[in-house]
From Swiss-Prot:
Organism: Arabidopsis thaliana
Pfam families from the UniProt entry: PPR_2 (PF13041)
Protein name in UniProt: Pentatricopeptide repeat-containing protein At1g09820
Keywords: Repeat
Record-linked InterPro entries: Pentatricopeptide_rpt, TPR-like_helical_dom_sf
SUPFAM superfamilies for the chain: HCP-like (SSF81901)
Family: Belongs to the PPR family. P subfamily.
PPR repeat positions: 152-186, 187-221, 222-256, 257-294, 295-329, 330-364, 365-399, 400-434, 435-465, 469-503, 504-534, 540-574
Keyword check for Membrane: no
Length: 606
């Protein structure tokens, strides 16, 4: 704390500086606009009024000069920029006068010259947050009115930061690019929040652009910046590029940390395809070799990745290693294992894991119960599912929509449609709004029971609410095709398009399969033409399988043979279903396919 005398001395020094600046200003024969300050001004009083924020008195005192003009003259003087900032704030708040960008950024230049950086940050944050409608190019023109590139760079850097912190990522990205055009050097402190804002909007390509520009402009990245870039690349499956960025870190003297490795491991786990978990495991080994200890997040990522790769033993091995290293599992760890066990039909082991979870002091949550109820339903254990559902409600927890949907689906699959509808009504009484999944379960149940009319009625209710999705249409289409009414299924294509939904291969395959089962190969072929010409969807393996089976079962084996050759000529690889159709519908019927120049061994099943 400064002595009182010193504080007063400093205040008087600011006031003296303000007074001397105004004295020079008002003794000048002309202003910037050529209008002299009225000679009767008591400049000491003006400065003192601004210092003390006596704005009503100031307004009376300067009636002979435009407030905006006074602001221009204050900035041009040697008045302390803090006083100019106070006057600006008062002017904007208490008058209809709009301050030009040129004057606004002159103020910021004066603050930057005085090294009042925190005030610039605060000013720009409010400037952006309050919805400034100024275009970025106009702002940069105003910034460039000062010849000091260093000062301009500081202001541009803080502007990008303000845009990023206020979720104005579009403007922040444009400001970043314009900074490059003007030659203003930004810092990692503004680039990192900008990249995070872009990443939240799934603009990974723009994150990669910012990173490359940082390298080109010689902006020193830090470990946090690198981690954001790695995350963006992993989200889009660019794992090789993410690996390259890890190498770049070393070049810039940054060591990858646990977040870097976790992001890369998670990227491999979510990538899909053969060998993904082998690569994730390799990153884990590299991590340990570089003396970076795996944490709870690392283990959770691997547990989840292994069971989703149909490698439940791998998940259990990671869980054991986790315990061996004294890393305490959390609810996410247990939920992943319970999900994996339920998915693999190991219900009793899933229940046992839930019990271990509780014994370890980790309380199950709705995700835990969702996983267990889903496991019960998938394994025809409806009674156990309902008991657990009752237990959830008994604990005062509110069941999720997904939980209700699983039970409704289980009822419908057992043919207990009325019970499914009763549960939907209970759901609504509890204030839980049924979603499209709820209706899809009920429509599917009605279709399976052959009650297509009731299914269509429920579909129409859903349509009136604007809720149907592609799954809804597919369910009803399959219902019509199952009843031998494929023409009605085909008519739903138009309704689908009216709702802005785009048919996929599966959509057309359902209708083609329906026509083939009815023996109407001409209609099936017309549907293929519609798919290829109107929707520009090329036949895939599943589409060819539908027609292959249709032609074969109709006894048109030569035509089926031609389709098989056409499929191979287009470079499509037969799958297990293709081989089964060829064997059962062609070879076993005494017809050996004539494959023209292609290797096709019917004894092999891929």
């Amino acid at each position: 704390m400064f002595p009182k005398s010193l504080a007063v001395s400093r205040k008087n020094s600011n006031l003296t500086k303000g007074v001397s600046g105004l004295r020079r200003l008002c003794s000048s024969s002309s202003t910037i606009t050529g209008s002299p300050c009225p000679p009767r001004y008591d400049v000491a009083v003006i400065a003192d009024l601004i210092e003390k924020q006596h704005w009503s008195k100031l307004g009376v005192h300067v009636t002979d000069i435009n407030p905006n003009e006074l602001f221009r003259q204050l900035i041009s003087s040697e008045l302390d920029p803090d006083l100019c900032l106070r006057y600006y704030s008062w002017l904007v708040k208490n008058s209809d006068i709009s301050v030009s960008l040129e004057l606004t950024f002159k103020l910021l230049h004066s603050l930057a010259n005085a090294k009042r950086y925190s005030k610039i940050r605060s000013f720009l944050d409010g400037f952006v947050r309050n919805g400034s409608d100024h275009q970025v190019h106009s702002i940069f023109h105003a910034i460039s009115m000062c010849d000091n590139v260093c000062v301009n760079s500081i202001i541009a850097d803080m502007l990008v930061l303000a845009y990023a912190n206020n979720s104005r990522f579009e403007l922040g990205f444009e400001a970043f690019k314009r900074s490059g055009y003007y030659g203003y050097k930004l810092s990692a402190l503004s680039c990192k929040p900008l990249m995070i804002a872009l990443l939240k909007e799934n603009r990974s390509a723009d994150v990669e652009y910012v990173y490359k520009e940082m390298i080109r402009r010689k902006i020193q990245p830090n470990v946090f910046t690198f981690n954001v870039v790695i995350n963006a690349l992993c989200k889009t499956g660019k794992m090789n590029k993410a690996r390259d960025v890890m190498e770049d870190m070393k070049v810039y003297g940054c060591s990858p940390n646990v977040v870097s490795y976790n992001t890369l491991i998670d990227g491999y786990c979510k990538l899909g395809g053969n060998g993904k978990m082998y690569k994730a495991d390799a990153v884990l080994k590299e991590m340990v070799e570089n003396d970076v200890s795996p944490n709870l997040t690392t283990f959770n990522i691997l547990i989840d990745g292994f069971w989703k790769d149909d490698n439940l033993p791998g998940s259990m091995k990671v869980f054991k290693e986790m315990l061996d290293q004294d890393v305490k599992p959390n609810v996410i760890s247990y939920n992943s294992l319970i999900n994996g066990l339920c998915n693999g039909g190991k219900i009793s082991e899933a229940i046992s894991m839930r019990d271990k979870m509780v014994s370890a002091g980790v309380q199950p949550n709705l995700i835990t119960y969702n996983a267990l109820i889903n496991g019960f339903c998938k394994n025809d254990m409806l009674k156990e599912a309902l008991d657990m559902f009752g237990s959830v409600k008994g604990q005062g927890a509110v069941p999720t929509t997904r939980m209700y949907n699983m039970l409704i689906d289980a009822y419908c699959k057992l043919g207990k449609i009325d019970d499914g509808f009763a549960l939907k009504e209970e759901m609504e009484r509890e204030g839980i709004v049924p979603d499209v999944g709820t209706y899809n379960c009920l429509i599917a149940g009605l279709c399976r029971n052959g009650n297509i009319e009731a299914a269509k009625k429920l579909f129409d209710q859903l349509t009136s609410k604007g809720l149907p999705d592609l799954v809804t249409f597919h369910i009803l289409m399959e219902g019509y095709c199952r009843k031998g009414e494929s023409r009605k299924a085909a008519m739903l294509l138009k309704e689908m398009s009216k709702m802005g939904l785009k048919p996929r291969h599966l959509t057309y395959n359902i209708v083609m399969k329906g026509y083939c089962k009815e023996g109407n190969l001409k209609a099936a072929t017309n549907m293929r033409t519609q798919m290829e010409k109107e929707r520009r969807l090329r036949m895939n393996v599943a589409s060819y399988n539908v027609l292959l089976q249709g032609y074969s079962q109709k006894g048109k084996l030569e035509d089926a043979n031609m389709l098989l050759n056409e499929m191979l000529e287009k470079g499509l690889v037969p799958n297990r279903i293709t081989y089964e159709i060829v064997k059962e519908e062609m070879v076993d019927q005494g017809f050996v396919p004539d494959i023209e120049g292609h290797l096709f061994n019917v004894s092999t099943k891929s």
